[in-house]
Design a protein with these regions (language model features):
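Extracytoplasmic/periplasmic sensory segments of membrane signal-transduction proteins
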Residues: 41-48, 57-154
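Extracytoplasmic/periplasmic ligand-binding sensor regions of membrane-associated signaling proteins
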Residues: 99, 118-191, 196-199, 250-251
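Extreme N-terminal signal-anchor transmembrane helix of membrane signaling/transducer proteins, especially
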Residues: 2-37, 41, 292-297
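Juxtamembrane interface helices immediately C-terminal to a transmembrane segment
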Residues: 9, 27-57, 61, 78-86, ...
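Solvent-exposed, extracytoplasmic
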Residues: 84-102, 182, 186-224
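Short, hydrophobic beta-strand elements of compact beta-sandwich sensory domains
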Residues: 173, 185-192, 259-284
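Cytoplasm-proximal transmembrane signaling helix
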Residues: 13, 17, 209, 270-272, ...
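Membrane-proximal, non-catalytic sensory/regulatory domains of signal-transducing membrane proteins
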Residues: 142-178, 204-208, 212-213, 231-267
Length: 334
């Protein structure tokens, strides 16, 4: 009788386990899609946050430069058309503007290539501003910020570069100055990405921003800021993908499979988030593990419960069997 009880319990439990496994597989497939969708949504939001930070950074600096240009151009042309005039009427403004905006340097590149500048060198000399040019083997007319500002006749932002003094990523924002139709020069500010990097350090995810030359200048992961760090794998794919279109790539550094979402920023920069595939899939497999544990636990409990339930309901059969055996023994039909 015990054998019958056990067999009934095992058969019933086997049916229950098969049903649970089928249900678990179907549930896992739907849960996997739902969780992956939520993870992609979260990663996309990280990129959007990084994009907003970069756009705000650029907008602040552009607006500041344009405001200074308007202020300078309020002077009559005779107060702007020579180096002496610029030093006398504008030099102090460059220093005040630099201090207020915490810029690395603020300067006017004149048509002859000479600078009137407020920068760390003038600070070291304990003066508000100074000049820089031919005597220092420097000609502003050969520099990208000057050439592009004059050529486009509008505000120009250089690709990021490493500042020699601070060894930090830096941008130059420049705009041409014209007064009464006369070219005065190019107004420019050097901007460290210190404030932008501080913002990124508080952002979620492994987000970063790079320029057209694939140089990362702000990132939640500081290892990406190292000179020569190769992001070509993700950068090349980002160029052919739509904004916020998820994709996978292989990182050359270690051959690991990774997941990414990228978007263009201001038409010049690219913001991305890049995570290992394992990290993206981890929540999915965690759910699968929990489901497997539940099936195993439920199966064990089912065997025990079914055994006792079957035992209870098969007990009368044992009594009947005993009675019949005694009856046939009595009439000698054993």
């Amino acid at each position: 009788m015990k054998s019958v009880k056990l067999k009934v319990a095992l058969i019933a439990n086997l049916i229950a386990v098969v049903c649970l496994v089928i249900l678990g597989v179907i549930t896992f497939m739907f849960v996997k899609q739902a969780i992956f969708h939520e993870v992609v949504k979260a990663e996309t939001n990280y990129v959007k946050t990084a994009k907003n930070s970069m756009e705000s950074f650029k907008a602040r600096n552009s607006l500041a430069l344009e405001s200074l240009a308007k202020s300078i151009l309020k002077h009559p042309v005779e107060q702007l058309d020579s180096q002496d005039a610029l030093m006398r009427y504008v030099g102090k403004d460059l220093k005040n503007f630099r201090d207020a905006g915490r810029f690395l340097a603020v300067y006017i590149a004149q048509p002859n290539g000479e600078l009137v500048v407020s920068d760390p060198d003038s600070d070291a000399k304990k003066v508000d501003f100074g000049t820089y040019g031919k005597a220092d083997n420097y000609d502003a007319r050969t520099r990208e910020y000057y050439i592009e500002a004059v050529k486009t006749n509008k505000l120009y932002v250089t690709p990021s570069y490493i500042d020699a003094t601070t060894n930090l990523p830096c941008f130059t924002y420049s705009t041409p100055l014209y007064k009464d139709g006369k070219f005065i020069g190019v107004l420019a500010v050097d901007v460290l990405v210190t404030d932008l990097q501080a913002e990124f350090e508080n952002l979620p995810g492994r987000t970063f921003v790079f320029d057209e030359e694939n140089k990362v200048f702000a990132s939640t992961d500081k290892t990406l800021l190292q000179q020569g760090y190769d992001i070509s794998a993700i950068a090349n794919l980002a160029k052919i993908k739509e904004n916020f279109e998820p994709f996978e790539y292989t990182r050359p550094k270690d051959g690991s499979e990774r997941f990414a979402v990228c978007t263009k920023v201001s038409g010049v920069y690219t913001a991305c988030v890049g995570e290992p595939i394992e990290q993206i899939e981890a929540p999915v497999y965690k759910i699968a593990f929990i489901q497997t544990a539940i099936v195993i636990f439920t199966s064990i409990i089912s065997v025990i419960l079914l055994y006792f339930i079957v035992s209870k309901y098969l007990s009368p059969l044992a009594a009947i069997q005993t009675g019949l055996t005694s009856f046939f023994d009595f009439i000698n039909h054993k």
